[in-house]
């Protein structure tokens, strides 16, 4: 038997080893996959983000953004002189400068390989991951931030519309004793509560904490309003049921000690009654007769219970508040109302100005809430000024003058929001809105319904209250959810 050449077994082993080595590559080729190599990953990155085997600064930024590298700062910032701390998050422009490249340079495959250790170091240090979300929010804020012309223009427009509400008081004086006036006033008070409360929940307070609608806080804020509305609805239903059940156990005396105003009510209750629908008790009866086109009877008595805080002196014999009077004859309450309204309107303007520096829709939402709150307040304030001794012209002038303080607050709000953080202003306005809605206007809404409840008319005011609350809530909810999708101008 002829012996095999000694080198033949070695050759066979080499052939078998070669077939075994090429089998994975043949399988990969048959599967349509490129052969793996050190450059495969680089080629994949270049094909995904680059063009013609090169990367521009914009294309590199896209890659770095996907890796959360270089997004902690402005990506076109210039490198600073001096030693660098490697734990700092560098921008893509800084990385270009570190490799002696300009912002208009293009890097090839060999240059990109030099970037890999830098990118890996940035990923390993995690210097940019904590700043990524804040940077994206800042970029979105800068892109959607209104210009100075838009801020001042929209701000002055909204404040002007709100201030004009102070001039509407004279137009409703002849209708103060009408039933529809009380119904309309009740609706606007409920609307003001819904808008103020919802604006604080959906926009002002979340903005003070730095939230945005993408943080899914809107649904939780809606649940907060739902809890408030649930207890309001339940309380009203229980009161109606208990009233009907206990009605036959009590007499029908409408002049009990609970309904008669106390001395404190006579001195301080004028402010509390500015929208209670009982405005006929705040105006002398003979003046109401003249407003209705009737001459006062000789046996009519002048009701001055709510006017006891002023020194009427000898003015009870005529409608002195329809004529011009000296400022010294005007009651102190009128000046207190004017000053407090001026401060109130200043804070309103502050909130409007700060809101417009963030976004147009933020400013519009705040303006809508303030408008719904100012309309019923201005009507009531006008009546208070009349009862304090002012003429119609004087009441209109000082009511409008206090409303113009909103312009001053607007200017301060815009300047503060443009140069400083507006979060503190939003926090202040949010607390103020909650107080006005729940502690001020909510009791007024209940007082308006007292006369209807005495007359066993529960359903109509209850429906009006619900319509006002839900309308205000819906307006603020829609403005919050779709503020980023609707474009103005």
Swiss-Prot record:
Residue interval(s) of motif XEXPHE-motif: 373-378
pH dependence (record): Optimum pH is 7.5.
Extracellular side: 29-155, 206-221, 371-394, 443-457
Subcellular location(s) of the protein: Cell membrane; Apical cell membrane; Basolateral cell membrane; Early endosome membrane
Induction cue: Up-regulated during the lipopolysaccharide/LPS-induced inflammatory response (at protein level). Up-regulated by IL6. Up-regulated by interleukin-1/IL1 via nitric oxide. Up-regulated upon endoplasmic reticulum stress induced by tunicamycin or high-fat diet (at protein level). Up-regulated into hepatocytes upon glucose uptake (at protein level). Up-regulated by iron in retina (at protein level).
Record flagged with keyword Cell division: no
A Pfam family per the record: Zip
Residue ranges of the TM segments: 156-176, 185-205, 222-242, 350-370, 395-415, 422-442, 458-478
Knockout or disruption consequences: Homozygous knockout mice exhibit growth retardation and dwarfism, visible even in neonates. They exhibit moderate osteoporotic phenotypes associated with decreased bone volume and trabecular number, and increased trabecular separation. The length of the long bones is also significantly reduced. The decrease in bone mass is associated with increased bone resorption. The metabolism of these mice is also affected and they constitute a model of metabolic endotoxemia with high body fat, hypoglycemia and hyperinsulinemia.
Residues carrying a glycan: 52, 75, 85, 100
Gene Ontology CC annotation, any one: apical plasma membrane
Superkingdom of origin: Eukaryota
Family: Belongs to the ZIP transporter (TC 2.A.5) family.
Subunit structure: Homotrimer.
Protein name (record): Metal cation symporter ZIP14
């Amino acid at each position: 038997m002829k012996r095999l050449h000694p080198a033949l077994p070695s050759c066979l082993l080499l052939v078998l080893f070669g077939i075994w080595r090429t089998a994975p590559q043949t399988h990969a080729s048959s599967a349509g996959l490129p052969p793996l190599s050190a450059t495969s990953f680089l080629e994949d990155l270049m094909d995904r983000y680059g063009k013609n085997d090169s990367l521009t600064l914009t294309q590199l930024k896209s890659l770095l953004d996907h890796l959360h590298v270089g997004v902690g700062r402005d990506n076109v910032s210039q490198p600073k002189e001096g030693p660098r701390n490697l734990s700092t998050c560098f921008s893509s422009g800084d990385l270009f400068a570190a490799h002696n490249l300009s912002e208009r340079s293009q890097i090839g495959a060999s240059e990109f390989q030099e970037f890999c250790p830098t990118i890996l170091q940035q990923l390993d240090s995690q210097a940019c991951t904590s700043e990524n979300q804040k940077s994206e929010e800042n970029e979105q804020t800068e892109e959607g931030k209104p210009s100075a012309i838009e801020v001042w223009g929209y701000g002055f427009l909204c404040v002007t519309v709100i201030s004009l509400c102070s001039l509407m008081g004279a137009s409703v004086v002849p209708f103060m004793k009408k039933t529809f006036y009380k119904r309309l006033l009740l609706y606007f008070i409920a609307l003001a509560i819904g808008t103020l409360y919802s604006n604080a929940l959906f926009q002002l307070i979340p903005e003070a904490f730095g939230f945005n609608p993408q943080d899914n806080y809107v649904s939780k804020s809606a649940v907060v309003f739902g809890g408030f509305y649930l207890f309001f609805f339940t309380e009203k239903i229980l009161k109606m049921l208990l009233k009907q059940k206990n009605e036959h156990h009590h007499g029908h005396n409408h002049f009990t000690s609970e309904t008669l105003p106390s001395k404190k009510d006579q001195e301080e209750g004028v402010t509390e009654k500015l929208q209670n629908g009982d405005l006929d008790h705040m105006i002398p009866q003979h003046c109401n007769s003249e407003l209705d086109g009737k001459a006062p009877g000789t046996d009519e008595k002048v009701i001055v219970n709510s006017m006891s805080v002023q020194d009427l002196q000898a003015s009870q014999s005529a409608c002195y508040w329809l004529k011009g009077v000296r400022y010294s004859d005007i009651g102190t309450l009128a000046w207190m109302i004017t000053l407090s309204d001026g401060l109130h309107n200043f804070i309103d303007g502050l909130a409007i100005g700060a809101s417009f520096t963030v976004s147009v829709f933020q400013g519009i939402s705040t303006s809508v809430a303030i408008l719904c709150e100012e309309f019923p307040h201005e009507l009531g304030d006008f009546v208070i000024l009349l009862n304090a001794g002012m003429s119609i012209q004087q009441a209109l002038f000082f009511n409008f003058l206090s409303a113009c303080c909103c312009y001053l607050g607007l200017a301060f709000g815009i300047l503060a929001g443009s140069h400083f953080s507006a979060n503190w202003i939003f926090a202040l306005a949010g607390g103020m809105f909650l107080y006005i809605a729940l502690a001020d206007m909510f009791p007024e809404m209940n007082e308006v319904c007292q006369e209807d409840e005495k007359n066993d008319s529960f359903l109509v005011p209850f429906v009006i209250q619900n319509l006002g609350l839900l309308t205000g809530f819906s307006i603020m909810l829609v403005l919050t959810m779709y503020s980023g999708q609707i474009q103005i101008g």
